[in-house]
Regions:
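A glycine-centered beta->alpha junction motif in the catalytic cores
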Residues: 2-6
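Radical SAM enzyme [4Fe-4S]-AdoMet core and its adjacent flexible, acidic
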Residues: 7-125, 129-163
Length: 164
């Protein structure tokens, strides 16, 4: 998740030692990166949730000038604490319509079972639709990639849809 407001960043966990993410430092770091590599492509990911759906990130996006802006509707994993409804998600998207040429938005249905994720233990994992956490494969190095891949739900059509 990303926010420009300190209190929102604290609520959504964008913090270090109880101090909110430094927005100005982030902008300076992006400037440094671009001075080193002027052709680098910057992608911003935003997870829209109950604390940031009404925020405007327009000034931030205008300053960063990313190549791509991925906007995700928060996926409830363990509970609904940060959940929003479709109307709130669309509200955020409508408020940022001027960036539609770089926005790629994904709702919960589009995200579920469409990512290949590997945890620090070397296991594939996927979200479980009933908000009970994750489903894990056995470790890839123990059973092989093919067997581990068969142990999790994955929808290739959804995966490919993001790259068309």
């Amino acid at each position: 998740p990303i926010s420009i407001k300190d209190n929102t960043n604290l609520l959504i966990g964008r913090q270090t030692n109880n101090k909110a993410m430094d927005y100005q430092l982030l902008l300076r770091n992006i400037e440094i990166i671009r001075s080193i590599n002027p052709t680098i492509q910057i992608k911003i990911n935003t997870v829209v949730n109950k604390h940031n759906y009404s925020e405007s990130l327009s000034e931030f996006i205008s300053q960063v000038k990313p190549t791509k802006w991925k906007i995700f509707k928060v996926l409830p994993i363990m509970n609904d604490a940060l959940s929003i409804n479709d109307q709130q998600f669309h509200y955020f998207l409508e408020n940022h319509h001027q960036f539609e040429n770089i926005i790629s938005a994904e709702n919960n249905e589009e995200m579920t079972h469409s990512y290949l994720m590997v945890d620090p233990s070397g296991r594939f994992f996927q979200n479980i639709e009933q908000q009970t956490g994750y489903q894990y494969s056995e470790p890839i190095l123990s059973v092989g990639i093919e067997k581990a891949f068969q142990q999790i739900p994955f929808e290739l059509v959804k995966f490919l849809h993001r790259y068309r």
